[in-house]
Structure formats: structure tokens, C-alpha cells
Amino acid sequence: MARYLGPKLKLSRREGTDLFLKSGVRAIDSKCKLETAPGQHGARKPRLSEYGTQLREKQKVRRIYGVLEKQFRNYYKEAARLKGNTGENLLQLLETRLDNVVYRMGFGATRAESRQLVSHKTVLVNGRVVNIPSFKVSANDVVSIREKSRTQARIKASLEVAAQREKPTWVEVDNTKMEGAFKRLPERSDLSADINEQLIVELYSK
């Protein structure tokens, strides 16, 4: 399955909520009708079945983190093998993706931009170049921007935008050095309350 390259607001309208796929700290403009789906008949929102509700939640989370279907299913399988709550495990695994950590640290304005930074060999993990967006970051790993890339205007702009967002407590960032430490796995209370991971567990448990 190919990665979606179309309008980002269309995805947010499809899910009925801001997926934070666009850069900036403000909520999506009020002109963008999140309560209606895109398309000619978007206003006619069908009543979803139980399966439909579960599927929509899975699609929403998958799109937030920019993960393809096969990858997402593999994350779920790994989460189910781990001890503890499967839904929380799933979110924690998604949060350890390098592209997501780069976004959380503020080096990329969006997860898509952060993924691009990683793919273009702009990011170091513990001093070594890593160009795999799905690379799993571990506790106490240090993520930084390559010295020759630190003058990039988009990275500086991203840090300015990130300064206006609520700072994640599980990462520690030095904007001057353009490096940060992944201190720990985020707890469920650290993450968005707008996600109902239990619906995803129910979907994959069928």
C-alpha cells in the first residue's frame, strides 16, 4: 500500500478531528469543516456500525503516526506479545519510532517532515547516522541533528513552532545543541485523550 500524498486536511476531515498533519500550533482553521467528511456527500455522515467505529479509530491513529497498514498490524502483534495493556503498549511502540521522536523533540514541524529529515540522513542516534524512520529509540538514547544540517531554516523554524507547543515530559531537548534525550517511555496519561486504543484492540481481536 502506497503512502498517502494528497491533501492533509482531507484526512483530518475524514476522521472528524485534527490529526496534526499540518505544521503550526493553532488548531485547523474554522473554515475547514471537520464535522463533515470530504467530498460531495460529506455532510451525509452515515451512522457507523461497531466494526466501522473500530476501523475509523485504527485509521485515525495510523494516520496520526504516518504508518502503513502492514507496519501498523506488526506493531499491534508486538504490543500483544508484551506484558501489560495491549492498547497502551501499541501507543508506546508508535512513540518510539525515530520519526516520531524527532517530531516530539521539535526538529520537524510534522511527523511527515521529521520522517523526511531521517530519510535524508540528517538525524543521528547516539552519534551515528540513522536513516530508517521506524528505527526504535530506547530510553536514554540521544537524538541529534548532524552538524552540517543545523543551519537549515526549516529545522530552526520547527524549533520555534515547537516552543509554542506543550513540551513532552519524556524527552529533554537542548535547542542550542540541537540534540535531545529520550528519557523514558511515555505513560498513557502523557498522550492524547482523543485516542481510544481499546477500539483498535477490539478490532484486531476479532
From Swiss-Prot:
Q: Name one Pfam family in it.
A: Ribosomal_S4
Q: Which domain of life is it from?
A: Bacteria
Molecular function GO terms recorded: rRNA binding; structural constituent of ribosome
> Which PROSITE patterns does this chain map to?
RIBOSOMAL_S4 (PS00632), S4 (PS50889)
Q: Which residues form the S4 RNA-binding domain?
A: 96-156
**SMART domains listed in its UniProt record:** Ribosomal_S4, S4
Would you identify the family this protein belongs to, as annotated? Belongs to the universal ribosomal protein uS4 family.
Q: What does this protein do?
A: One of the primary rRNA binding proteins, it binds directly to 16S rRNA where it nucleates assembly of the body of the 30S subunit. With S5 and S12 plays an important role in translational accuracy.
Complex and partners = Part of the 30S ribosomal subunit. Contacts protein S5. The interaction surface between S4 and S5 is involved in control of translational fidelity.
Name of the featured protein: Small ribosomal subunit protein uS4
What's the source species for this entry? Shewanella denitrificans (strain OS217 / ATCC BAA-1090 / DSM 15013)
Name of the gene encoding the protein in the UniProt record: rpsD
